[in-house]
Amino acid sequence: MEIPKLLYIAVIAIGLSGSLTCATPLANPLADPEAEAEAKATAEATAEAIAEALAEPEPGLPILALFVTIPFIHHYLMEKLG
């Protein structure tokens, strides 16, 4: 079965547009002087939120986060245990 060239072009265009959209605010801090400070504040807030979530007494939440963020480990464990 042959995949149409238009599908390849669409996938590449969507991938590039998504990566450019995500990278634009951080790509050129000279264009927006507050972009670097905003990115640093966002990174610090994210780090604090992760630290607070991991410090909670419920041990299931970090395990659930691990399974959600790294699905191949979940698949491996389910294959071995199941």
From Swiss-Prot:
Compartments, as annotated in UniProt: Secreted
Chief localisation class: secreted
UniProt note on tissues of expression: Expressed by the venom gland.
Keywords linked to the UniProt accession: Amidation, Ion channel impairing toxin, Neurotoxin, Secreted, Signal, Toxin, Voltage-gated sodium channel impairing toxin
Molecular function (Gene Ontology), one example: toxin activity
Propeptide: 24-59
Protein's job: Toxin that causes a slowly developing temporary paralysis when intrathoracically injected into insects (blowflies). Does not cause spontaneous nocifensive behaviors by intraplantar injection in mice.
Name of the protein this chain belongs to: Myrmicitoxin(1)-Pm3a
Organism: Pogonomyrmex maricopa (Maricopa harvester ant)
